[in-house]
Amino acid sequence: MAPPPPSPPAVSLKVLLLLLRVLTGVFLVIALIILSTNSVTIVSQGSALKFHFKDVYAYRYMLSAAVIGLVYAVIQLFFTISEFATGVKNPFNYQLDFYGDKLISYLVATGSAAGFGVTKDLKDTFLALVALDSTDPVDKFFSKGYASASLLLFAFICLAVLSVFSSFAMAKRN
């Protein structure tokens, strides 16, 4: 026998959780695209130096955090859609939600913080060496670093809200 249909507040909460999972994935995908395509060519004294995001360790960490977060978001999106369609939640999903949301949210938050920190430090160092204006390609490189870090921050906010809901669900379950 099928479970009774959920009450309207439970449906709207499930829709909110689904929306937050989708937003998390979207923020992480856009951050990945911006970060992975971030490069600049610096011409100095007749020689050109190609500088990629992967030349900065903190940007690599950001990329790793975004990839791991995206994999988790896709897995959770699958489970959320499955639960939404069937109306039944696997007991294992409570623990996955509880621990996974917390772990991945902190990973994404530290990726964002690393991105903001290294971008500011590198930009300040570069400004001390060379006059930089907003049309300079190097400034665009740093702006993309800030954009990626901002998107990771937005993904963290979504994951933090999801973490609060998963804490309530875990407490309610026990």
Swiss-Prot record:
InterPro entries: CASP_dom
Parts of the chain on the Cytoplasmic side: 1-14, 82-97, 172-174
A family per Pfam: CASP_dom
Main location: membrane
The entry's keywords: Cell membrane, Membrane, Transmembrane, Transmembrane helix
Gene Ontology annotations for the cellular component aspect, listed alphabetically: plasma membrane
Domain of life assignment: Eukaryota
Topology in membrane: Multi-pass membrane protein
Residues exposed to the Extracellular side: 36-60, 119-150
Subcellular location field: Cell membrane
Family: Belongs to the Casparian strip membrane proteins (CASP) family.
Quaternary context: Homodimer and heterodimers.
The protein's name: CASP-like protein 4D2
Annotated source species: Arabidopsis thaliana
